[in-house]
Amino acid sequence: MKVPRLIVAGTESGAGKTTITISIILKLLANQMKVKPYKIGPDYIDPQFHRLASGVPSENLDLWMMNDDQIRYLLIEGSREFDISVIEGVMGLFDGAGSDFTGSTYDLARRTGTPIVLVIDGYGISATAAAIVSGIKAYAGELLRGVIVTRVSGESHYRLIRDAVEEKTGVPVLGYMIRNEKAVLESRHLGLVQAYEIDEIREIFGAIDSSTVIDMHQIIDIARSADKLETLYSPEIERLGTFKVSVAMDSAFDFYYEENLRMLKRMGASIRYFSPMGNEVPDADSDLIYLGGGYPEVFAGKLQSATDTIEAIRHAASIGTGVYAECGGYMFLCRSLESTDGHIYGGVGIIPASVYMDASLVIGYREISAKRDTSILRAGETARGHEFHKSRIRFDGPYDHPFVLKSRSSSFEDGFSSGSVTATYAHIHFLSNPRVAENLLIA
């Protein structure tokens, strides 16, 4: 299948990938094109910016949580009703699991035949940009189809970089972004701020758009040159019945993989969103309450005041309604929760544990295996996901955790499971094991 697409990659984190991705999306929309965004890697936050810019959900593509055929499947299925797909890379172009580039943005590009547009930071350099691009071209080869330069001081600065790069490397330079303090995406303790928390986000997007000059004809031509995608993969998903799933969705809880929600729907779930921040309650006849990750530690005071939400979740758990929580949702279910400013607030209280904040970030891929039967995995079953948090959970007494999380260098116990309630720090991608979604609905 022909899927016009390109990858926006960077020389490093902070080069401006997200900003340029947003700019390209906005300019394609202005050209009356339907745009489908994707993000390489497990990150939840960049896709929120993509969604706000494009108006449609952005999906994650990850070579550790998925195999090649699943990646192609997501690209084919997700792009069917769109004119072009824009895929934002992760870290630097070649940064992955090792020196062979496994799991990197480049790795996904070569496995899917997707052309690359490279973003380089032009601040403080001119002809040196040619050496940077030359080195990257030596590894990326013909997949490298263009360059966009960020943080240039003006058009004359841009021309110096453009002329050097094109003369020395033969790689076309497609445009630039002027330094503009109004076109900056803010940051927070875990990375980029959640998109809808930024004040006047539309004004920021407008500043990004007006600060960038990009040859969109070349962008479109590059995307249309991408290899055809073929796959025999189709997830073995059957409709299991009719289910009601209540999903927490607001500024405290909004880290969900789009494919996870879609898989639940394919199995027969109708999804209704509720806001703990707004003291809303899940449907009383829910078969499952799904509490995803987010930033409950930032909003702990307001969440403590959400007494209707808290009581509804407690009641649901007491009558055997399925409750599944990941990371931030896991924290919210605990007895107490420390906020980012050091205050202690009450949580739902169905997990006998307290949450405290730590200076160090826990981050990385995880293989999760069940030590005993739970509502997401039966004993011995495994799935894949990742962790990304600064909090820690301390149980009130000795507790036999239901899961073992394995990283590249170690393994450790995690999570909570009792009755119909299951929680883990891991953000699991259901495509790594569709049994997770099935178990949740028929538990």
Swiss-Prot record:
Biological or metabolic pathway of the protein: Cofactor biosynthesis; adenosylcobalamin biosynthesis; cob(II)yrinate a,c-diamide from sirohydrochlorin (anaerobic route): step 10/10
UniProt xrefs under Gene3D superfamilies: 3.40.50.880, P-loop containing nucleotide triphosphate hydrolases
Keyword Thylakoid among UniProt keywords: no
Biological process terms in GO annotation: cobalamin biosynthetic process
NCBIfam families in alphabetical order: cobB, PRK01077.1
PANTHER family: COBYRINATE A,C-DIAMIDE SYNTHASE
Chain positions of site Increases nucleophilicity of active site Cys: 427
InterPro entries for the chain: CbiA/CobB_synth, Class_I_gatase-like, CobQ/CobB/MinD/ParA_Nub-bd_dom, GATase_3, P-loop_NTPase
Cofactor dependence: Mg(2+)
Domain notes: Comprises of two domains. The C-terminal domain contains the binding site for glutamine and catalyzes the hydrolysis of this substrate to glutamate and ammonia. The N-terminal domain is anticipated to bind ATP and cobyrinate and catalyzes the ultimate synthesis of the diamide product. The ammonia produced via the glutaminase domain is probably translocated to the adjacent domain via a molecular tunnel, where it reacts with an activated intermediate.
GO molecular function, one term: cobyrinic acid a,c-diamide synthase activity
Sequence similarity: Belongs to the CobB/CbiA family.
Protein role: Catalyzes the ATP-dependent amidation of the two carboxylate groups at positions a and c of cobyrinate, using either L-glutamine or ammonia as the nitrogen source.
Domain GATase cobBQ-type: 244-435
E.C. code: 6.3.5.11
Catalysed reaction equations from the record: cob(II)yrinate + 2 L-glutamine + 2 ATP + 2 H2O = cob(II)yrinate a,c diamide + 2 L-glutamate + 2 ADP + 2 phosphate + 2 H(+)
Keywords: ATP-binding, Cobalamin biosynthesis, Glutamine amidotransferase, Ligase, Magnesium, Nucleotide-binding
Name of the protein in its database record: Cobyrinate a,c-diamide synthase
Other remarks in the entry: The a and c carboxylates of cobyrinate are activated for nucleophilic attack via formation of a phosphorylated intermediate by ATP. CbiA catalyzes first the amidation of the c-carboxylate, and then that of the a-carboxylate.
